[in-house]
Amino acid sequence: MSEIASRVKAIIVDKLGVEESEVTETASFTNDLGADSLDTVELIMEFEKEFGISIPDDQAEKIGTVQDAVAYIEEHAK
């Protein structure tokens, strides 16, 4: 697991209060991890803060799984 993936996983565990074992690459924030729309917005904001990036709303809407988040951040983080 990459450093970015580990950090993303830690943020998800912290913000959603789920077990680390539940946070798999294919886990959906809403369907598998129980996030509502507000939780998802808070996750995106935390990813932006943690990685020093800006995620436009149209891109944020496409980030629905752990792997989606990791891939976006790996592509855009400096």
UniProtKB/Swiss-Prot annotation:
<dbReference type="GO" id="GO:0009245">
    <property type="term" value="P:lipid A biosynthetic process"/>
</dbReference>
<dbReference type="InterPro" id="IPR009081">
    <property type="entry name" value="PP-bd_ACP"/>
</dbReference>
<comment type="function">
    <text>Carrier of the growing fatty acid chain in fatty acid biosynthesis.</text>
</comment>
<protein>
    <recommendedName>
        <fullName>Acyl carrier protein</fullName>
    </recommendedName>
</protein>
<dbReference type="GO" id="GO:0000035">
    <property type="term" value="F:acyl binding"/>
</dbReference>
<comment type="pathway">
    <text>Lipid metabolism; fatty acid biosynthesis.</text>
</comment>
<dbReference type="InterPro" id="IPR003231">
    <property type="entry name" value="ACP"/>
</dbReference>
<comment type="similarity">
    <text>Belongs to the acyl carrier protein (ACP) family.</text>
</comment>
<dbReference type="InterPro" id="IPR036736">
    <property type="entry name" value="ACP-like_sf"/>
</dbReference>
<keyword id="KW-0597">Phosphoprotein</keyword>
<dbReference type="GO" id="GO:0016020">
    <property type="term" value="C:membrane"/>
</dbReference>
<dbReference type="InterPro" id="IPR006162">
    <property type="entry name" value="Ppantetheine_attach_site"/>
</dbReference>
<feature type="domain" description="Carrier">
    <location>
        <begin position="2"/>
        <end position="77"/>
    </location>
</feature>
<dbReference type="GO" id="GO:0005829">
    <property type="term" value="C:cytosol"/>
</dbReference>
<dbReference type="GO" id="GO:0000036">
    <property type="term" value="F:acyl carrier activity"/>
</dbReference>
<keyword id="KW-0276">Fatty acid metabolism</keyword>
<keyword id="KW-0443">Lipid metabolism</keyword>
<keyword id="KW-0275">Fatty acid biosynthesis</keyword>
<keyword id="KW-0963">Cytoplasm</keyword>
<keyword id="KW-0444">Lipid biosynthesis</keyword>
<feature type="modified residue" description="O-(pantetheine 4'-phosphoryl)serine">
    <location>
        <position position="37"/>
    </location>
</feature>
<dbReference type="InterPro" id="IPR020806">
    <property type="entry name" value="PKS_PP-bd"/>
</dbReference>
<keyword id="KW-0596">Phosphopantetheine</keyword>
<dbReference type="GO" id="GO:0031177">
    <property type="term" value="F:phosphopantetheine binding"/>
</dbReference>
<dbReference type="Pfam" id="PF00550">
    <property type="entry name" value="PP-binding"/>
</dbReference>
